[in-house]
Regions:
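Charged (Asp/Glu and Lys/Arg) segments that form or flank catalytic channels of large polymer-
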Residues: 1-30, 35, 39, 43-46, ...
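Short acidic, Gly/Ser-rich segments with clustered Asp/Glu that frequently serve as metal-coordination loops
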Residues: 50-55
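Short, solvent-exposed loop/turn and secondary-structure capping segments
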Residues: 56-58, 186-187
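Compact, glycine/acidic-enriched structural inserts
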Residues: 61-120
Length: 290
């Protein structure tokens, strides 16, 4: 619990004070938040992604942990499951079974007691041995988990939640608002980043988000995690920044700086010095693409 709590009760209280300051629907309506003191609530999150492995194979990796944990990834991310993507059954059957167990596990942590039933809703019996003996007992003394985040790249979020609106759609592409990929109304296009963009006025409430997912023929078990909320479903910062806009923003900035031969500061001076090399690399890339 020392690792999951961020090292101290004060770290937990500080995190929850920040969360309370947002005054959002998730905080106000989460049953675990309303029934447990902040120094006993561990904010939990989980992350998923298809990780590249040997010889081009991919592995679906899901891990979980505390949002307030401090330390390196090896110590703070706890593996939940890993399965080769090629071994997944067609459709959603394999993932459904995995996410049923994840949902069941997180809900047990949020209740703070060893579960009395398995992920299928069947009660444990004497044949289940240790699980039956521990059923209903405190799981972590007086601590409870509190789901606070689902994180991943867009592909995994789409597949894990069965999002009908995604990057593969020609119309609506976002699970949080009604923004579109192509539209005669420029204001509703996803490329409109203005603060007054019309699509910002279409942000879904959590109930609207849940209604969309529940209306589908197949529903992801993850939306039945206690306290599940659209505002706590987020894109992994690695994919948004490092593998996303930085790949465009950084080269663009370097191009502008070297083109104008900016010299202010030692850093810019170094950029000017590598300008010939950058031009050569750009020429090589164009030749390869041709």
């Amino acid at each position: 619990m020392h690792l999951l709590s961020g090292g101290s009760e004060s770290a937990l209280i500080e995190w929850w004070n920040d969360a309370k300051g947002l005054s959002d629907d998730w905080y106000e309506n989460h049953p675990v938040i309303q029934t447990n003191p902040p120094e006993r609530r561990i904010p939990l999150g989980f992350h998923g992604d298809d990780a590249g492995t040997y010889n081009g194979e991919k592995t679906l990796a899901v891990n979980w942990g505390s949002i307030v944990s401090v330390g390196c990834t090896l110590d703070t991310r706890l593996p939940f499951t890993m399965v080769k993507v090629k071994d997944l059954l067609p459709g959603f059957e394999t993932e459904k079974s995995i996410y049923e167990v994840l949902t069941w596990s997180l809900n047990a942590l949020q209740e703070g007691k060893f579960p009395t039933h398995n992920e299928r809703g069947l009660p444990f019996t004497e044949k289940d041995g240790w699980r039956w003996k521990m059923a209903g007992k405190l799981l972590a003394n007086s601590y409870v988990g509190c789901w606070a985040e689902m994180r991943g790249d867009w592909k995994w979020l789409k597949e894990a939640l069965l999002l009908p609106d995604n990057y593969g759609s020609n119309a609506k592409i976002c699970f949080k608002c009604a923004v579109v990929k192509f539209s005669a109304n420029v204001g509703m296009r996803y490329t409109n980043f203005r603060r007054d963009a019309p699509h910002r006025g279409t942000i879904y409430s959590n109930q609207e988000f849940m209604d969309i997912l529940l209306a589908a023929c197949v529903v992801s078990p993850l939306i039945f995690i206690t306290g599940f909320h659209v505002t706590r479903v987020v894109f992994d910062i690695l994919h948004v920044l490092d593998l996303g806009i930085y790949q465009v923003a950084v080269p663009s900035a370097m191009k502008e700086l070297t083109a104008t031969k900016a010299t202010a500061g030692a850093g810019l001076g170094k950029l000017v010095g590598v300008r010939p090399t950058l031009k050569e690399l750009a020429g090589t890339r164009r030749a390869v693409e041709a």
